């Protein structure tokens, strides 16, 4: 919304604001029996339009300095009014329009609420004017909280000597960081990495963020002691205002802050280049003080430079050869910064839970070497193999030009008490659709990166456990799964992390794709703002939009994977024991096509999957590809999701499963559609009956094989005793998947324990993964022998389940 002049922009914004007020004021003329919702729904988007107009005006350079606060106040007023109108609509049972303008208005509100961190106001970034450091000396009433080590040194706050500004930013030569008595090693490691990178590749770390600046864009001494630091905080570049006072020891004048010196530095009392301690003061101010224990260097580099952060665990599932190659190639182009983190257990010479910076990496013959910087000590070298063994995490920051195309969205998660009493918190997860289009389909498919960031408000409030789930539709050419999500086993690691940034690198499978992005959080107890950034190479275009939380018809059901029902993935013989549901899709209005959506939210440590099957609402014992209508794809921790573009009116069976047998947990399942749907549980096999489970083993002596083999009577026998007539059913299966054909036959017990009359058999020997079943049958009271056998005298374990509508006993007798 570009404006030619300040007056034009102010008039547009004011007119929209007045129109919104007049629309809302018309409520007073409504009949007492008329609903206020339609009028409020008209007023809401007009308020948002007014807020957008004020926002565009503020982001321009048209507003005179003297009017900025007035325009900001009007902007806040219309936003606050919009929030109140939206809240009123929802209280009355209505919904605000799902138009893009509403999303934009909500995003503006999210960024505005994120402007207070640890009690420090951090307004959205605007380049400061040339005279902001003129006038009376600027001194803040409260200085950042000091760390215990600083307090022990009898601190005082005083200004930097003017001649210190002769030591300018480290753009050439060798500069070193000295941490000093500061608790946070991560930001010092980040700054050390940035300075070394600047010396090698000419990047500008930190000093371009500090104002005022001279004609060359370098920080200079403030005339009145007021500085402004530019940091990327809570989804946007923001201003941190600070004064020029720094802590020194009264005893010996030693600086009680991190310093940056030409190597080697001369005296312990030397301040070095003043931009570094001042930039760090601004950082510590907004993060709660010098006593901050630290996070990780990649988050700090992201705040100062906007380089994309990535954390890679060096233990489970780490591919060291692949990562070295990727990292080394980017390093030599100046496209990556590297840092490291230790865990709670370290070898001698390393500090636990400590951050280290990598200032150089190289190959010497067959050796791969890293030069590592310790903020609290000195530098040392390690081989790549040593690093992978000794450190817990690899932190990378990627130059934004590597992924120049971006799309960004902001939103807020409500705190649980704000949800309706019958709401499932998982269903409140905001969903986005990322449309990806490669300009040259013939080229090799690239990755897209998606960064989930949670906004911080206080150092005393713990971060949420967050995850980002990415699902890709297979597209119209995959007729088997009707556009269901691509399936490929199990997620490599649990995606939940207790961090403020989480990067997912997603390998595209087609030039044009629609990715469904579902951020989720676990145990979140507060309203929290979040930002979602998508990144792609120059050859790929992106669009990111929020999608509706629900389709018109929704059915929800809660369930539980228990020790008895958790059967694992379809490769396990026990998959049939998983919870199954009858799903009925009824015809919609007219001849319109029906689409659907499956969403499951479960415990975050369990990998989940849901399949919709042509099962006619009956139990499905074994899956085949032609039965699958829709599939949520790879087993994913905490969530399962898929869109179903085409859904026929019919009766289906739906199966919920975890990856491994015995993985238990509660879940909430939602089935949405554009036509009426219903979902009800299907009773498990043998439900409501007495049950006995017999575990046995075919040994060299007892593997008798099939009847025609001559040794059939050597097979194990399970004696079943019925005290009165009963209906029974039984199933024999192998505990692990195996191509061994098996059979179960039931005999009357003859005199002396011999096999008597054959009553029922499961038929031809079968290697079906779910085993073989006798089905339901009626038997008189008496003693019976059940004989499990394999076709080829195979040795190994077997499991026999027997159900009866009367009490029974069953045990191996031979």
From Swiss-Prot:
Required for the proteolytic cleavage of the transcription factor RIM101 in response to alkaline ambient pH. This is Calpain-like protease palB/RIM13. Belongs to the peptidase C2 family. PalB/RIM13 subfamily. Transmembrane segments: none annotated. It comes from the Eukaryota. Residues 118-400 form the Calpain catalytic domain. Its EC number is 3.4.22.-. The keyword Protease applies. GO terms for biological process: proteolysis. The lineage of its organism: Eukaryota, Fungi, Dikarya, Basidiomycota, Agaricomycotina. Keywords: Hydrolase, Protease, Thiol protease. InterPro entries: Calpain_III (IPR022683), Calpain_III_sf (IPR036213), PalB/RIM13_Calpain-like (IPR051297), Papain-like_cys_pep_sf (IPR038765), Peptidase_C2_calpain_cat (IPR001300). The keyword Lipid metabolism does not apply. It comes from Cryptococcus neoformans var. neoformans serotype D (strain JEC21 / ATCC MYA-565). The active site is at 185, 354.
């Amino acid at each position: 919304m570009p404006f030619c002049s300040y007056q034009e922009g102010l008039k547009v914004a004011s007119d929209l604001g007045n129109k919104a007020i007049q629309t809302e004021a018309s409520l007073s003329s409504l009949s007492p029996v008329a609903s206020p919702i339609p009028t409020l729904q008209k007023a809401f988007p007009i308020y948002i339009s007014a807020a957008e107009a004020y926002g565009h005006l503020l982001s321009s350079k048209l507003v005179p300095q003297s009017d900025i606060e007035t325009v900001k106040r009007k902007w806040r007023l219309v936003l606050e009014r919009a929030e109140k109108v939206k809240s009123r609509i929802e209280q009355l049972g209505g919904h605000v329009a799902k138009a893009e303008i509403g999303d934009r208005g909500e995003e503006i509100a999210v960024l505005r609420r994120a402007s207070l961190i640890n009690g420090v106001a951090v307004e959205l970034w605007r380049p400061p004017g040339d005279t902001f450091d003129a006038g009376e000396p600027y001194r803040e009433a409260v200085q950042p909280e000091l760390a215990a080590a600083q307090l022990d040194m009898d601190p005082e706050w005083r200004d930097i000597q003017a001649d210190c500004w002769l030591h300018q930013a480290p753009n050439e030569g060798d500069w070193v960081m000295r941490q000093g008595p500061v608790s946070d090693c991560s930001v010092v490691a980040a700054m050390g990495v940035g300075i070394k990178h600047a010396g090698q590749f000419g990047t500008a770390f930190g000093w371009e963020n500090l104002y005022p600046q001279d004609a060359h864009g370098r920080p200079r001494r403030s005339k009145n002691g007021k500085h402004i630091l530019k940091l990327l905080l809570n989804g946007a570049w923001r201003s941190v205002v600070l004064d020029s006072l720094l802590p020194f020891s009264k005893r010996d004048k030693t600086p009680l802050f991190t310093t940056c010196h030409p190597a080697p530095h001369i005296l312990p009392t030397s301040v070095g280049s003043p931009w570094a301690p001042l930039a760090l003061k601004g950082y510590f101010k907004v993060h709660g003080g010098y006593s901050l224990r630290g996070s990780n260097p990649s988050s700090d580099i992201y705040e100062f430079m906007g380089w994309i952060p990535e954390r890679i665990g060096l233990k489970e599932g780490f591919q060291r050869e692949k990562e070295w190659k990727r990292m080394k190639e980017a390093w030599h182009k100046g496209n990556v910064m590297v840092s490291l983190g230790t865990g709670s257990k370290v070898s001698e010479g390393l500090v636990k839970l400590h951050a280290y910076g990598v200032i150089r990496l190289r190959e010497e013959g067959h050796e791969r070497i890293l030069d590592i910087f310790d903020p609290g000590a000195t530098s040392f070298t390690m081989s790549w193999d040593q690093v992978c063994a000794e450190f817990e995490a690899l932190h990378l920051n990627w130059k934004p030009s590597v992924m120049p195309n971006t799309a960004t969205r902001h939103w807020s998660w409500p705190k649980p008490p704000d949800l309706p009493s019958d709401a499932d918190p998982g269903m409140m997860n905001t969903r986005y659709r990322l449309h990806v289009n490669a300009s040259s389909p013939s080229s090799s498919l690239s990755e897209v990166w998606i960064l989930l960031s949670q906004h911080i408000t206080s150092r005393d409030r713990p971060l949420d456990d967050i995850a980002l789930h990415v699902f890709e539709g297979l597209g119209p050419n995959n007729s088997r799964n009707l556009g269901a999500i691509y399936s490929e086993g199990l997620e490599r690691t649990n995606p939940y992390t207790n961090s403020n940034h989480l990067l997912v690198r997603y390998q595209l499978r087609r030039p044009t794709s629609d990715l469904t992005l579902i951020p989720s959080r676990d145990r979140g107890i507060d309203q929290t703002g979040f930002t979602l950034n998508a990144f792609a190479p120059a050859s790929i275009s992106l669009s990111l939009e929020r999608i509706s939380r629900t389709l018109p018809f929704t059915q929800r059901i809660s369930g539980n994977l228990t020790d008895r029902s958790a059967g694992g993935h379809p490769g396990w013989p026990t998959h049939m024991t998983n919870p199954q549901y009858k799903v009925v899709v009824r015809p919609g209005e007219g001849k319109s096509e029906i689409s659907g959506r499956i969403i499951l939210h479960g415990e975050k440590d369990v990998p989940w999957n849901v399949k919709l099957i042509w099962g006619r609402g009956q139990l499905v014992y074994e899956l085949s590809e032609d039965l699958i209508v829709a599939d949520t794809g790879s087993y994913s921790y905490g969530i399962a999701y898929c869109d179903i573009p085409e859904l026929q009116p019919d009766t289906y069976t739906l199966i919920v499963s975890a990856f491994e047998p015995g993985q238990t947990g509660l879940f909430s399942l939602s089935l949405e559609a554009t036509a009426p749907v219903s979902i009800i549980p299907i009773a498990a096999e043998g439900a409501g009956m007495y049950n006995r489970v017999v575990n046995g083993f075919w040994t060299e002596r007892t593997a008798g094989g099939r009847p025609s083999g001559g040794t059939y009577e050597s097979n194990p026998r399970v004696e079943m005793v019925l005290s009165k007539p009963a209906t029974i059913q039984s199933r024999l299966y192998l505990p692990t998947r195996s191509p061994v054909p098996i059979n179960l036959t039931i005999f009357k017990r003859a005199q002396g324990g011999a096999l008597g009359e054959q009553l029922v058999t499961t038929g031809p020997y079968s290697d079906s993964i779910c085993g073989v079943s006798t089905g339901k049958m009626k038997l008189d009271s008496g003693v019976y022998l059940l004989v499990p056998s394999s076709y080829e005298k195979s040795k190994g374990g077997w499991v026999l389940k027997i159900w009866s509508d009367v009490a029974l006993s069953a045990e191996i007798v031979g």
